[in-house]
Amino acid sequence: MPGPIAGVRVLELAQIMAGPACGLMLADLGAEVIKIEKTAGGDDTRKFLPPDINGESAAFMMMNRNKKGLALNLKEQEGINIFKKMVEQSDVVIENFRKGTLEKLGIGYEDLKKINPKIILCEISGYGRTGPYADKGGFDLVAQGMSGLMSITGESFDKPPMKVGAPLTDITAGILGATGVLAALINRDKTGKGQRVDTSLYEAGIVHTYWQSAIAGATGKSPGPLGSAHPLTAPYQAFKTKDNWITIGASNQNNWMNLLNAIERVDLQEDDRFKDNNSRMKNLEALAPILQEELLKKTSNEWIKIFDEKGLPCGPINSITEMHNDPHTLDRKMVIEVDNKKAGKSKAIGMPIKFSDTNANTEIGAPNFGQHTDEILMQFGYSAEQIKDYRDKGIVA
């Protein structure tokens, strides 16, 4: 079934995580995404080994399913000419190079819009294309630190700084990039013109500080790390049980009472320290140990059953493999099986948005290096003889 943006052609001139995440989202929405890799080894994640499956990088296969692969040498003018010809017949270009890289190659936005005024260029960088840090390179770790995320992650100020375990700013920047592309496509339908979309890892980190920035803006003080707790409501955190850990979200008065009924401690509501959210936040250091003592009396599954019956939001702390095998994950098709020509069958994360009428096929495996080079070039009008000549000269692979 064609996806909601079927017919849109995307040239993904990006590698590793942020740019490929953007391309993956657009591919899962139905776009034709052509991943353009350098002829000298391809996307750097192809070398992120181990783990691998039959020599194919698991990291690369995760981020690049549902795409076609072309290996193109943009250091040679003939490679640039091929890229420009592709731009003529495409809708979107995604790139995550340092500022000025495309301009030096003669394929910056001003160059591209002369070739195709409708082209949309999505630039995902460390800090964006303007501002005092625009020329700096960026990585998720650095963006998490500079955006304030690492100052609110972890257990306390006296512990070493801690980053979020997942590459949060990379993935979020990719999603923001895809959102920007979709908005630019809608605007193009109205105006007939493309435009430049500019986002960054730094900004992707900042948007995850909404609550903490609200606190800092109101008080003038920066909130710190709270472990698994919430900066504005309580109790809302992880607790140890008889055999494991669970999370409990008793973040409003109704759920607070549901929790007290479930653990048979309604008496706590009579304690002025815990009567409302404001009181509970002020006295969380006293409240948490009381709740912890009660929750150690039963196993996680026992508590989850009780809390579910009360309608109290709760859940286990799953490992990644436990999440993969959770029946809800499987029912929602968030872990899918894809097929790679060399690696064979492997697991991938599925599309997190479902549509009633336009769900696209998401189960096409990532391309092997240069797998679709001939097919793609023929699609753009090149003959078999021309392609052979380009391959012999190292223009394509």
Across the structure, where does each feature detected by a protein language model lie?
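N-terminal helix-loop segment corresponding to the beta1-alpha1 unit
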Residues: 1-190, 368, 374-397
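Short, well-structured beta-strand/strand-turn elements
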Residues: 33-36, 308-322, 383-388
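Glycine-rich beta-alpha junction loops
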Residues: 40, 127-128, 201-206, 243-245, ...
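Conserved Rossmann-fold dehydrogenase catalytic segment
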Residues: 129, 158-167, 189-205, 224-231, ...
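Oxidoreductase and adenylate-handling cofactor-binding alpha/beta cores
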Residues: 174-194, 207-218, 260-267
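Aromatic-enriched alpha-helical interface/lid elements that frame and gate functional surfaces
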Residues: 234-310, 314
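A glycine-rich dinucleotide-binding beta-alpha-beta segment and adjacent secondary-structure elements
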Residues: 309-363
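Flexible, small-/acidic-enriched active-site or ligand-binding loops
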Residues: 343-389
